[in-house]
Amino acid sequence: MERIERDTLGEISVDATKYWGAQTERSRRNFAIGDNYMPKEIIYAFAQLKKAAAKVNALEGKLSEAKSVAIGNVCDQIIQGELDEHFPLVVWQTGSGTQSNMNVNEVIAHVANLTLGEEKVHPNDDVNMSQSSNDTFPTAMHIAAYQALVTKLLSEITKMEEVLTTKKNQYMQLVKIGRTHLQDATPLTLGQEISGWEACLTNNKNYLESSMKAILPLAIGGTAVGTGLNASKDFGDKVAEELRKQTGYPFTSDSNKYFALTSHSPINFVHGAIRSLASDLMKIANDIRLLASGPRSGIGELTLPANEPGSSIMPGKVNPTQCEAITMVAAQVMGNDTTINIAASQGNFELNVYKPVIIFNFLESITLLSDSMRSFRIHCLEGLTANESVIEAKVNDSLMLVTALNPHIGYEKAAKIAKLAFDENTTLKEAAIKTGFVTEKEFDLWIDPLKMTNL
């Protein structure tokens, strides 16, 4: 069954079971590109915005109370996910996001009209009143981005941080050999090493919390080119106030709407902090899989939980699969950052027309990082253990303990001891005594791996 919808280009048939209208249907047919659909977070953010705008328009006497309430009720249904099937458009559409704005307008109008009597809601005249796609889409971008950061990414960072804190405390007294340039270095404790990973998360969370303030100012009220044509002078401020009430987040009206429509440097800036997190997660995961390499022919200082068979041909193999997954996600996020950076540079004159691809990649980064961090935390970090016998053996066998002799016999003599031990494949202690530079008693007094950690 189909019904006929009309727009300024004429008539078009639409599936009678769907709530969208003519402009959505034209976009659905004209942009059959891939399967990357407009993120639901954007649709829900649009609904929050349309509800707020309807309230303000009613307060200003431009929209009837009945229409405002009807629009708000449909927006609530959208936010709750009850109308997801009626938003079929892909990301690869007009760069202003106009078709998705109209998709939301049409669905809201259609469903609202199912409950109203003779007073019909129009997608443009009522739902889109005092608005343009040019200011609503960037507003929805900021709402969706901020909410995703708070509800997804920041909470996962905190949870992983807590696991690392536990591991740090558990292994704070376990001395191991440090490594710089992939070569043996002076000792530290495993807890100290883990504290570096922990600080990566703490600092990146701080970077995010600081940078995400940049996306609190909203473009709404700028309408088509930033002048606010067809909207009241304080429409943006009033809508931002309504959004603060709805969401509990401190959104404001951007003081310069020309900037808000043509530049996406705030999103670009915040994603830089997300990319930084991805970089550090790649570092942490790489450290863990290298320290767990083996179990007998690698470093073998850490033992990974065995979650699944590692090989289809080699029995008993356990692979660092969670490390591999999260590092692939990190690579994807770095790629997303490049896309966002390029797209953000395309603000020609009064409007950036790469908006959908910017927010698609931004939200994908948040989803992938949040999901992979949860998986990595549960299936890797929580079950990660130290192979203490291997760690102890490597400490005892290390030549870099000789560094502790520097203050007592000087760098050159200490270097000769290390070289002799290496050349003759003896212990550092045997080489030190053989050179006559130190006595056995002095060696035992000065070479204390735990003291060398300055713990």
UniProtKB/Swiss-Prot annotation:
- Add the further remark from the entry: There are 2 substrate-binding sites: the catalytic A site, and the non-catalytic B site that may play a role in the transfer of substrate or product between the active site and the solvent. Alternatively, the B site may bind allosteric effectors.
What are the site positions for Important for catalytic activity?
Answer: 324
Q: Which GO terms describe its cellular component?
A: cytoplasm
Gene3D superfamilies for this protein: Fumarase/aspartase (C-terminal domain), Fumarase/aspartase (Central domain), Fumarase/aspartase (N-terminal domain)
Q: What is this protein called?
A: Fumarate hydratase class II
GO BP annotations of the record are:
fumarate metabolic process; malate metabolic process; tricarboxylic acid cycle
EC numbers on record = 4.2.1.2
What is the scientific name of the source organism? Listeria innocua serovar 6a (strain ATCC BAA-680 / CLIP 11262)
